[in-house]
């Protein structure tokens, strides 16, 4: 899973 916030 990949998550990138602002």
Swiss-Prot record:
Cyclopeptide (Val-Pro) crosslink residues: 1-6
The family this protein is said to belong to: Belongs to the MSDIN fungal toxin family.
Keywords per UniProt: Toxin
Keyword Iron-sulfur: no
Reported modifications of this chain: Processed by the macrocyclase-peptidase enzyme POPB to yield a cyclic hexapeptide. POPB first removes 10 residues from the N-terminus. Conformational trapping of the remaining peptide forces the enzyme to release this intermediate rather than proceed to macrocyclization. The enzyme rebinds the remaining peptide in a different conformation and catalyzes macrocyclization of the N-terminal 6 residues.
Molecular function terms, GO-annotated: toxin activity
Disulfide bonds: none
Name of the protein this chain belongs to: Cycloamanide A
Entry function: Cyclic hexapeptide that belongs to the MSDIN-like toxin family responsible for a large number of food poisoning cases and deaths. Cycloaminide B is non-toxic to mammals but shows immunosuppressive activity, probably through the inhibition of the action of interleukin-1 and interleukin-2.
């Amino acid at each position: 899973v990949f998550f990138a916030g602002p």
